[in-house]
């Protein structure tokens, strides 16, 4: 289908160009490419056939989009290009005359132009609205006309445009192409304009009935004002897209923005494909329903976008689109009887020129303006910008019906909110478990505590403890919790919860040993370990044993050690609990360096010892004590916690130097000698197990004794081997008590064998024990 496109020349004279439209436009624009009826325009040398369009000629029952756009085309019967001199006839309506004053290129002018050379419209109602009601809009185009204007004016009109056209001293214009019906058998006294969408292909199937719907017999002014030519101007990537109009293409739906847009091959940017002439204007039409959908969503098709970046496009909401959508909604609310209706097409062109802002540059400017002015357009930005601006908005990228509010907290409020650590919760659970039962009551997620056992000035006080209220605990309660902490590591974790807890608990100093819980125990008058009466006191201490992981140049290593703090404030001592002579880590070749804050330290076990002071000879002369002085003595003891109502009853068993056992009961607050060894052997090791004390002597024959709290002593049958062991120890493993023996063969001092007697021994050990006659002790 060939057609003539009327373009404005330098002298405002119509210049026609022969052109043919090639079928290479995308599929979603195909429904507008069907050939319709065309009206013939002729110059003064030829006659013009004219037909009027009347509302009663409409065909009802066919569904047509309510807002098709329109275009006017000019068809020449001859191949000769002729310059047309436009003129204006006097019998045109007043409203049309006003239109001609603003848009002279739409009406022919000249003295030689007769009444047959113009379009006759009904003049009984001389209003622009009635005039447009008689015209069925088909399509609208926007072109660039070669009109010479002052450069300063054109610069203001085209400021910020990035359309790939030559815009030097030119202004955007427009032309209308009317497609009159070629089937004259159905026309009634005039030319019928039909929609390109509802028309059929007349070249293949012959004359057919025009199926245009009666729903578009009128063109509403308020909806026509909402047309923005910014969406019709093509970018540099879509410049020169043609129209495929040779076959009837069924109506297609608007492509979903979440799906990959169809790829459109690039063609030559030419208007006349036969001549190969390159046009200086990019022409592209767009369906109005893309802009006037019910939810006013802008659908933007960019065929060159890769599939991997589709989610990026969904996140990139251009503020220019939101501003255009808002302007469309505001213009739709305009009244039908406003005075600006006469300036309809000029307003459309003006709005199209103003909206021709580059999409790749405007978001930066508009975002900065919105941030400075604090406008409502900030609600259309991304959620991360909303959080950055600290403003409660609703994201426009979310589906309909879902709202997301962003109300970030201030930095000071965030710092005030304390979040408890696992160590804090563990300490609280351990401390609260040691309180009196009548003072605790658990209610759902709250722990209610009645502080009746504290010396408060008021009788009762209740505190609701929740996970987020650690800093709100009173100092009296913190001191009570502090009393249930047993090791210095627990104190360290306690102080690391929050600042209010650190202010209540003082830091550890040199007066307290690391990981020690002390008890002041008084000796009986008339009894001492050396057999002499004394009134001195001894101190019971708990020595924890830790498994320390530290880094070495050869990799990670582990160390089993007990920790002590020196009195003079020097670094802590690491002692080996398995060494009889007390090897000190940190001296000589055994020096170990590690950070107690970053190195993993796992509680492994503990043992107890007592410390007392007594006079001992410091110098001897001729085998006799010459000088005595007070010496601090430390002895290892075994501690047994007893079950009682107040949970404060305990017992301590001590193996004296006089081959006897001495027991201390907290209920009696006195030391009692249990029994002397029948064979005068000293006791080598002690252990508390299942409410009783167990002791093994130094004979090396595996002689184990059970000591009851009633001071009764019972010997377990011998589990000794064929030879004497060099060292024996009692070890608790879960619910069992094991006897460990270490043997040193004669003549081979450094070769040692260890036997473990118990129900969970290795098969090899069990076999050797059966052969040697060993018995298992449980």
Curated annotation (Swiss-Prot):
GO CC annotation: nucleus
Q: What does this protein do?
A: Together with PCHL, regulates growth and development adaptation to the ambient environment by controlling negatively phytochrome B (phyB) dark reversion, a temperature-dependent thermal relaxation process during which phyB reverts from the active to the inactive state. Contributes to red (R) light-triggered photomorphogenesis. Promotes various light responses such as seed germination, hypocotyl gravitropism and chlorophyll biosynthesis, via direct interaction with PIF1 and COP1. Prevents DNA-binding ability of PIF1 to negatively regulate the expressions of its target genes.
* Cysteine-cysteine disulfides: none
Q: What is this protein called?
A: Protein PHOTOPERIODIC CONTROL OF HYPOCOTYL 1
Instruction: Give the domain of life.
Output: Eukaryota
Q: How is it modified after translation?
A: Ubiquitinated by COP1 in darkness; this leads to proteasomal degradation.
Give the residue range of the signal peptide. Answer: none
Effect of disrupting the coding gene: Reduced seed germination in red (R) light; this phenotype is reversed in plants lacking PIF1. Reduced PIF1 degradation in response to red light pulse. Hypersensitivity to gravity stimulus and increased greening. Increased hypocotyl growth independently of far-red (FR) pulse at light-off, as the result of a rapid loss of active phyB due to increased dark reversion. Suppression of cop1 phenotype in darkness. Highly unstable phyB-containing photobodies in plants lacking both PCH1 and PCHL.
| Location relative to the cell | Nucleus
InterPro entries tied to this protein: F-box-like_dom_sf, F-box_dom, KIB1-4_b-propeller, PCH1
Corresponding gene?
A: PCH1
Sequence segments annotated as region (Disordered): 74-95, 186-283, 316-335
Residues in F-box domain copies:
470-505
Positions with biased composition (Polar residues): 317-326
């Amino acid at each position: 289908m060939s057609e003539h496109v009327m373009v404005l020349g330098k002298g405002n004279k119509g210049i026609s160009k022969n052109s043919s439209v090639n079928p290479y436009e995308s599929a979603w624009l195909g429904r507008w490419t069907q050939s319709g009826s065309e009206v013939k325009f002729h110059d003064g040398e030829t006659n013009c056939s004219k037909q009027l369009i009347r509302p009663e000629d409409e065909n009802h029952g066919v569904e047509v989009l309510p807002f098709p756009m329109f275009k006017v085309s000019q068809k020449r019967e001859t191949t000769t290009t002729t310059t047309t001199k436009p003129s204006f006839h006097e019998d045109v309506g007043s409203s049309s005359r006003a239109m001609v004053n603003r848009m002279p290129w739409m009406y022919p002018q000249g003295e030689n132009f007769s009444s047959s050379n113009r379009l006759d419209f009904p003049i009984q109602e001389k209003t622009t609205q009635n005039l447009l009601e008689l015209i069925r809009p088909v399509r609208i185009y926007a072109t660039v006309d070669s009109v010479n204007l002052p450069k300063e004016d054109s610069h203001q009109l085209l400021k910020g445009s990035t359309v790939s056209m030559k815009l030097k001293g030119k202004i955007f214009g427009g032309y209308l192409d009317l497609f009159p019906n070629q089937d004259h058998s159905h026309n009634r006294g005039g030319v019928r304009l039909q929609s390109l969408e509802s028309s059929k292909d007349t070249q293949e199937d012959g004359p057919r009935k025009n199926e245009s719907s009666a729903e578009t017999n009128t063109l509403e002014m308020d909806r026509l004002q909402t047309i923005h030519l910014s969406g019709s101007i093509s970018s540099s990537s879509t410049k020169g897209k043609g129209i495929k109009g040779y076959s009837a293409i069924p109506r297609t739906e608007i492509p979903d923005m979440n799906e990959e847009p169809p790829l459109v091959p690039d063609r030559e940017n030419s208007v006349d494909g036969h001549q190969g002439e390159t046009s200086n204007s990019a022409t592209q039409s767009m369906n109005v329903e893309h802009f006037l959908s019910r939810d006013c969503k802008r659908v933007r098709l960019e065929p060159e976008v890769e599939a991997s970046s589709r989610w990026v496009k969904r996140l990139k909401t251009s503020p220019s689109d939101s501003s255009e959508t808002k302007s469309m909604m505001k213009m739709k609310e305009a009244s039908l009887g406003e005075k600006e209706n006469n300036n309809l097409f000029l307003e459309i062109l003006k709005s199209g020129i103003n909206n021709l802002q580059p999409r790749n540059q405007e978001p930066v400017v508009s975002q900065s303006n919105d941030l400075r002015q604090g406008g409502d357009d900030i609600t259309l930005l991304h959620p991360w910008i909303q959080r950055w601006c600290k403003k409660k908005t609703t994201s426009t990228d979310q589906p309909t019906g879902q709202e997301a509010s962003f109300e970030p907290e201030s930095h000071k409020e965030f710092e005030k909110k304390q979040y408890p650590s696992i160590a804090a919760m563990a300490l609280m659970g351990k401390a609260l478990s040691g309180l009196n039962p009548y003072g605790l009551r658990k209610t759902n997620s709250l722990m209610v505590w009645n502080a009746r056992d504290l010396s408060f000035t008021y009788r009762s006080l209740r505190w609701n403890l929740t996970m987020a209220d650690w800093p709100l605990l009173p100092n009296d309660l913190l001191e009570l919790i502090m009393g249930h902490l047993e090791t210095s590591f627990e104190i360290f974790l306690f102080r690391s919860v929050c600042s209010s807890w650190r202010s209540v608990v003082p830091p550890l100093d040199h007066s307290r040993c690391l990981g020690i819980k002390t008890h002041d125990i008084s000796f009986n008058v008339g009894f001492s370990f050396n057999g002499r009466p004394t009134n001195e006191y001894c101190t019971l201490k708990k020595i924890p044993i830790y498994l320390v992981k530290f880094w070495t140049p050869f990799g990670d290593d582990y160390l089993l050690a007990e920790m002590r703090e020196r009195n003079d404030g020097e670094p802590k001592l690491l002692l080996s609990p398995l060494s009889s002579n007390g090897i000190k880590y940190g001296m000589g070749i055994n020096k170990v360096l590690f950070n107690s804050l970053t190195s993993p330290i796992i509680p492994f076990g503990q043992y107890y010892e007592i410390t007392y002071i007594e006079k001992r000879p410091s110098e001897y002369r001729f085998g006799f004590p010459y000088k005595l002085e007070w010496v601090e003595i430390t002895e290892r003891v075994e501690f047994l916690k007893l079950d009682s109502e107040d949970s404060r009853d305990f017992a301590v068993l001590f193996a004296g130097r006089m081959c006897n056992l001495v027991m201390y009961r907290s209920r009696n607050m006195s030391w009692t000698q249990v029994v002397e060894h029948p064979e005068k052997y000293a006791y080598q090791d002690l252990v508390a197990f299942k409410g009783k004390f167990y002791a093994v002597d130094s004979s090396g024959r595996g002689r184990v004794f059970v000591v009851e709290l009633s001071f009764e002593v019972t010997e377990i049958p011998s589990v000794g081997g064929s030879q004497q062991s060099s060292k024996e120890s009692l070890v608790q493993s879960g619910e069992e008590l094991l006897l460990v023996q270490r043997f040193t063969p004669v003549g081979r001092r450094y070769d040692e064998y260890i036997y473990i007697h118990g129900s969970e021994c290795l098969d090899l050990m069990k076999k050797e024990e059966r052969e040697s006659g060993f018995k298992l002790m449980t």
